[in-house]
């Protein structure tokens, strides 16, 4: 009988799906889902999926994916297609050093844009404040607060 679960881990050929048991269920993806677009990462961590778990001693099968609420994705460099890194999350926590290594606002900005495009709330956490001046902290804080 099919069950609904959440993908909690992905390896090259397997997905680990939490269906409320003590251990996650090891699953394969059905060929008909894979052949729709074999180059694309169809199932991501966080996806809600319907799985067939008929035989408790064997790996299950992912039958279909349920619609995503949110996603954090990036463009794959080879063909510019979207690669979903995580789905159905509520928040993205971006941890960035103020110093050592220096703050990289371009990188932080990309996370904010990716989170916003995927429907996620994004929060910036600044680390290594003890190595920074009050002015450096205030400058970064004021910049991102002014952006919303």
Where do the PLM segments sit?
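N-terminal accessory targeting/assembly segments
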Residues: 1-105
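Residue-level signal for inorganic ion chemistry
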Residues: 46, 115, 127
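Short glycine-/polar-rich loops that comprise or flank the Walker A/P-loop
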Residues: 88-91, 118-122, 147-148
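Structural beta-sheet core signal
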Residues: 94, 124-126
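Conserved Walker B
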Residues: 98, 128-129
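Residues at alpha-helix caps and immediate loop-helix transition turns in enzyme cores, especially N-
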Residues: 104-107, 136-137
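Histidine-anchored nucleotide/phosphate-binding helix
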Residues: 106-119
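Canonical P-loop GTPase G-domain recognition
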Residues: 121, 130-148
